[in-house]
Curated annotation (Swiss-Prot):
This is TNF receptor-associated factor family protein DDB_G0272098. The keyword Nucleotide-binding does not apply. It comes from Dictyostelium discoideum. Probable adapter protein and signal transducer that links members of the tumor necrosis factor receptor family to different signaling pathways by association with the receptor cytoplasmic domain and kinases. A zinc finger (TRAF-type) spans 122-190, 191-248. The MATH/TRAF domain binds to receptor cytoplasmic domains. Residues 739-757 have a biased composition (Acidic residues).
Length: 1084
């Protein structure tokens, strides 16, 4: 229908020019399509073809000739006259032409009819000579899309009258095979017969019979009589070839076939045996592999069950401690109530202070009516009461300031409390990655999901593929879709309060352990040491001048506290602007610790014992003090390390070990309260001594006070110790009141006191001898004092030799008078002291069983490594019946290691299973000294393990070596207990190695080793043999377990440790009391 009419007109010249378009020159109607068969004109009769009108109206809305407005085609009218004239013309049928592009005429098969233009459409529908495309070609292309059309030849246009003839010859026509009746295309017929058709008849080349193609091969191999074949016994050695129909004759005539038959039978029997052996070996290996797989699966199932049980327990604990948003209001009420209770402490304090003042006034009024001797005693007690009142007020002020600070902190926390801070605090405490919070339920979930049982490590990389769940405290935090509830803050506060109460009780019952020396310490100059000696001499001279006046006041400052094991005393003193002010402060705040011999004695002996306690003081320790003298106005930041002898390792006959430490404590607000309670328990009671003893006691007190002033001036715990002394003075005030009441009854008991004084004077010589013996014994049991104390004693002896006999006699008389008045008090005080001594003995016996970390012990262990040999490894690395290997770090270090408790391996805080795949590949790739590293994170600590397949050095190249190292972090040291387990198919044969209480350190100041492990875990020959059960499918598994981690304060530099520690502390071997062993080379 798209063919132009002008192309098919029979008489083109007969049409007038008025039927052509004036714009394009074509016929006004030039299309057979009925919709386009029309000529359009404007109102004035100007006619154009349809295409010209459409193009013109796009540009202008008017007629091109008369300019009449024309908005669209609808405004134009049809010119029916022109349509009738054009439709009356004659045209040819389009089927006259073979193709309409060039209008090539098909004179043989083309349509010869001539028709009118208006009849053309009807004729085309009925014309029998229409040309079409070949359908067979289209069907062939659809059935074989893989064939490229460019390689094929199309059939072209075909006249409808010739379609039948074309199908008989068309190559793409579908036909049926005459042999197998299979449908094929005519173009594939020849290939089908030659290669594909199985039913095509083929003649046998030997017998000339015809068989189908699918049977011809079988015919030749088994049935064809003319085929040439080998003898049946060709395997036995017969090389005869003949036609099949002659084979029977050959078998009958030949006699050597029996030999061939026997040979064939033997070969077959041998083949059968080999096959049988192969099957047995293969099945045995399969059974062994199955057993190993089953045992490993059982072991993994057991571990899963343990993990499931742990998770169930944790879920129960978490459910019990779940908190919702509705409990936050209760928490705010709780905080407000605590604030009110603490704020009411001021009223209670004021009421108590008023009562104390009233009691003191009444006591003073009553004392004015006593006799002259009593008045003197009352004046002494009154002066001590005034001093105690001052100290009490200072202590109360310190407590009030502390309480106010706590109130402000609680108010700030209550104002800033919200759910986000609670979640953030829990995340920091348990070292958990950020989690998502789901709305009002306040539940924490993690976004990631991992499978712990599929834990596999890559031998080429340091990092592992999946993370093992980490056990931190009571919770397991794993990157999996598990829900963890938030514990209530109220329950946490209750637990913290209980822990603080337990710590306070322990501190009251036993002395705190000696803290480690501070990190930054330096040695003072000789000028400072000379200043100390000058101050000592000046203070001694001043006291000699005021000796007769202030004997009683100076002797009050001595307090006794006995310990059978370790006695630690902390001395503090405030510096004044001049010597007199400093001496008054010394008399107010001094607290010295003395050790008295506790022996069976009567009441009279106890009085003499109290008089001589100042002489029997033996304080021998490793002291660390900060020097600042009273005369200096500038505070010195340098510190002095007092040189002492080696640590006490041998106990005396009485089992006494005394230790005094001028220590710098690091304490928090909680520790300040507990320390105040501990110091308040030690009651300061006045003691009256003889005149000679009084002078020596005064000198010793002055010496200790000067050392205390050195400590107090720059110690970071100055305020803490000052509060403790003020609390002691407050407690002493109560004792002074008791002494007043006792003095009122002295007149009634005058005769009894005289008798007791006579007995006491009779036993003076015996008591002095006993005290000299006790001094000798205690000096043997303890360490010798430092150089400064030795110089002080020398000065004291010189002063004693210069004293006159007159002063001694006067002092003796004054002491006798005071003894007559205070015998009853001394008896009571000594009885109390004996009870305190017994309590201290019990506490110290308990303290001996506790574990105390000693940094010198770890330094000894580090130096052991270089002196050990392979024999010591084998001794310490023995395997127990349970497969455990206990390493040398658990051997005792002298007698102090009896205090080290064995770690409880049931409380494992971290377990990680490492799978090492393809052992042969690892063995070939990692040579001597080349390790496989894996990172591990346990809470806030980061470690990495190292496995040396071929040993760390040439000496251990035949062994497997394993180490656990701490990732480098400055100024951080820990004590760790851990173990490894090399899994075996038989769990009883698994190798377990563990290390207890090992020090891991990464400091740039101190050259400590940073890893622990074992150089000879297992021989490679044992591991490489798969029959031993360690290798399964060329893989082995190592379990890493961590039992505890303890933070350790950072040690001082090595050059100070060498000066402060005794020479005997640098031994390179460690021995135990039961057996002598050397520590193996387990640390690098």
């Amino acid at each position: 229908m798209d063919i132009p009419i002008i192309k098919l007109l029979v008489e083109k010249d007969s049409i007038s020019k008025k039927y052509y378009c004036p714009d394009c020159g074509e016929l006004l109607i030039n299309n057979f399509n009925p919709e386009k068969f029309k000529a359009l004109q404007c109102k004035n009769g100007h006619t154009k073809c349809l295409q010209c009108w459409e193009q013109h109206l796009k540009l202008r809305k008017n007629c091109l000739q008369c300019k009449v407005p024309v908005s669209s085609i609808k405004d134009l009218s049809l010119n029916l006259y022109i349509a009738q004239k054009i439709s009356a013309n004659k045209v040819y049928c389009k089927n006259r032409y073979y193709e309409t592009k060039n209008f090539t005429i098909d004179e043989e098969n083309g349509c010869k009819e001539i028709i009118r233009v208006d009849e053309y459409e009807k004729h085309i529908k009925e014309c029998p000579l229409t040309y079409t495309d070949c359908k067979n070609y289209d069907d062939f292309i659809r059935a074989n899309p893989q064939i490229d059309e460019k390689l094929l030849k199309r059939c072209g246009k075909i006249n409808k009258s010739l379609l039948d003839e074309h199908d008989e010859q068309c190559l793409y026509q579908t036909i049926t095979c005459e042999h197998c009746n299979e449908l094929i295309n005519r173009i594939d017929h020849e290939i089908h017969l030659s290669e594909w058709c199985s039913d095509i008849p083929i003649k046998c080349e030997d017998c000339k019979h015809v068989f189908k193609k699918k049977y011809i091969q079988e015919h030749k191999e088994s049935n064809c009589p003319e085929s040439v074949i080998d003898c049946v016994y060709v395997a036995g050695g017969c090389q005869k070839k003949l036609k099949r129909y002659n084979m029977s004759k050959h078998l009958v005539t030949a006699n050597h076939h029996s030999q061939y038959m026997s040979k064939i039978i033997e070969e077959q029997n041998q083949d059968i045996k080999e096959l049988h052996n192969f099957i047995e070996n293969h099945l045995s290996k399969k059974f062994i592999d199955l057993d190993t797989i089953v045992n490993i699966q059982k072991y993994l199932i057991k571990n899963k069950n343990q993990k499931i049980s742990q998770l169930t327990e944790i879920i129960k604990r978490v459910d019990n401690s779940f908190i919702g948003l509705h409990e936050f209001d209760e928490l705010e009420d709780y905080i407000s109530n605590t604030i009110d209770i603490i704020s009411n402490f001021d009223n209670y304090k004021n009421s108590n202070s008023n009562n104390n003042n009233n009691n003191k006034n009444t006591n003073e009024n009553e004392n004015t009516n006593e006799n002259t001797n009593e008045n003197e005693n009352i004046d002494i007690v009154g002066n001590s009461d005034n001093e105690n009142n001052i100290n009490e007020n200072k202590a109360e002020n310190n407590i009030n300031s502390f309480i106010k600070e706590q109130i402000e902190l609680i108010k700030i926390k209550s104002q800033q409390f919200d759910i986000n801070s609670v979640i953030e605090e829990i995340r920091k405490n348990y070292n958990v990655e950020p989690y998502q919070v789901n709305g009002d339920n306040a539940m924490i979930t993690s976004p990631n999901k991992t499978d712990v049982d599929n834990l596999v490590f890559d031998d080429d990389e340091d990092d592992f593929d999946l993370e093992e769940p980490q056990i931190v405290g009571e919770f397991i935090f794993n990157k999996s879709q598990e829900t963890i509830a938030i514990p209530t803050l109220i329950r946490q506060q209750q637990q913290q309060q209980q822990q603080q109460q337990q710590q306070q009780q322990q501190q009251q019952q036993q002395p705190p352990p000696t803290p480690l020396p501070p990190q930054n310490t330096t040695i003072t100059n000789d000028i400072q040491m000379e200043n100390i000696n000058e101050n000592i001499n000046n203070n001694i001279n001043e006291n000699n001048n005021n000796n007769n006046k202030n004997n009683d006041d100076d002797n009050i400052t001595a307090a006794t506290a006995t310990n059978n094991s370790n006695t630690t005393s902390t001395h503090t003193i405030l510096n004044g602007t001049n010597n007199e002010a400093s001496m008054t402060d010394i008399n107010e705040t001094t607290s010295t610790t003395t050790t008295a011999e506790t022996t069976e004695a009567t009441a009279s002996e106890s009085t003499e014992e109290s008089n001589n306690t100042a002489e029997t003081t033996t304080t021998t320790t490793t002291t660390t003090t900060t020097i600042t003298t009273a005369a200096e106005t500038v505070n010195s930041t340098e510190t002095i390390t007092l040189r002492t002898s080696e640590k006490v390792e041998e106990k005396g006959k009485d089992g006494l070990e005394t230790t005094e430490s001028f220590s710098i404590l690091n304490s928090t607000e909680n520790s300040t309260i507990s320390s105040l309670k501990v110091l308040s328990n030690s009651m300061i009671e006045p003691e009256i001594t003889t005149d000679k003893e009084n002078e020596t006691n005064i000198k010793e007190s002055i010496e200790t006070k000067i050392i205390e002033s050195i400590v107090e001036s720059s110690s970071p715990t100055k305020s803490l110790l000052k509060q403790g002394k003020e609390q002691e003075q407050k407690n002493q005030n109560g004792n002074g009141n008791e002494n007043e009441n006792e003095n009122e009854n002295e007149n009634e008991n005058e005769n009894e006191n005289e008798n007791e004084n006579e007995n006491a004077n009779a036993n003076v010589n015996e008591k002095e001898n006993e005290k000299e013996n006790s001094n000798i014994n205690t000096s043997n049991d303890t360490e010798p004092t430092n150089d400064i104390l030795e110089d002080i004693k020398k000065n004291k002896e010189n002063e004693d030799s210069n004293e006159s006999e007159d002063n001694k006699n006067n002092n003796i008389k004054s002491v006798e008078d005071t003894n007559n008045n205070n015998n009853n008090n001394n008896n009571n005080n000594n009885n109390n002291n004996n009870n305190n001594n017994n309590n201290n003995n019990n506490n110290n016996n308990n303290n001996n069983n506790e574990n105390v970390y000693d940094i010198k012990k770890d330094r000894n262990r580090e130096n052991v490594e270089d002196s050990n040999d392979n024999n010591s490894k084998n001794e310490n690395g023995k395997i127990n019946d349970n497969g455990d290997v206990k390493m040398g770090s658990e051997d005792k270090v002298n007698d102090d290691d009896d205090k080290m408790a064995m770690v409880d391996r049931s409380n494992t805080i971290f377990r990680n299973q490492i799978l090492f795949k393809d052992f042969t590949k690892l063995n070939a790739r990692h040579g001597v000294g080349v390790s496989i590293k894996h990172n591990h994170t346990i809470g806030k600590y980061k470690f990495y393990s190292e496995l040396f397949i071929n040993g760390e050095t040439e000496n251990e190249k035949d062994y497997l070596s394993f180490y656990l190292n701490k990732c480098k972090k400055e100024n951080e040291s820990i004590i760790i207990s851990f173990g490894i387990e090399l899994l075996n198919v038989d769990p009883k044969k698994s190798i377990r190695v563990y290390w207890d209480n090992e020090l891991l350190n990464n400091s740039s100041q101190v050259m400590y080793n940073y890893g622990y492990g074992e150089t000879t875990v297992i021989k490679k020959s044992i591991l490489e043999d798969p029959n031993n059960g360690f290798l399964v499918d060329n893989c082995f598994i190592v379990n890493l377990e961590v039992y505890k981690i303890i933070d350790v304060p950072h040690p001082p530099p090595a050059h100070l440790l060498q000066k402060s520690s005794p020479p005997a502390a640098t031994t390179t071997t460690t021995t135990s009391s039961s057996s002598s062993k050397t520590t193996p080379k387990t640390k690098r």
